[in-house]
From Swiss-Prot:
It is an enzyme of class 2 (transferase). The keyword Transferase applies. The gene is rlmH2. Belongs to the RNA methyltransferase RlmH family. Its main location: cytoplasm. Keywords: Cytoplasm, Methyltransferase, rRNA processing, S-adenosyl-L-methionine, Transferase. GO terms for cellular component: cytoplasm. GO terms for molecular function: rRNA (pseudouridine-N3-)-methyltransferase activity. It is found in: Cytoplasm. This is Ribosomal RNA large subunit methyltransferase H 2.
Amino acid sequence: MNYKVYATGNKIEKFYSDAIKEYQKRLNRFCNISFTNYKNPQQLPKQQIDKYYKIGILPSGKSLSSEELAEKIKELELSAKTDILIVIGNEEIPLNESISISPMEMSLGLASTILFEQLYRAYKILNNEPYHK
């Protein structure tokens, strides 16, 4: 799987960036994943976006457990949707679906960190590896 994670909004605090980098490093054994923070939605490279299956992270999106997220990843792989764009903090891009980390509003850095942690957890589940529950 190839993931691009785009976060749009204010700059992300260093401690969140450090946590995201750590999860990126851990995820590299399961998938290819990149993270880019854009100050505003107009900076998004729209010409590249069309080839991706687009998932938005929104408070109003569908709630998933860690196991359900793992199953969603498996379904995407089986349906040959291997280029995934995950967008945090932007509702202007047409999405294929949206999921929720929480119905509460949270900072862009926290939402991004939680997303990376949950992706890591999902891959540990898919590979039958232990992970704290």
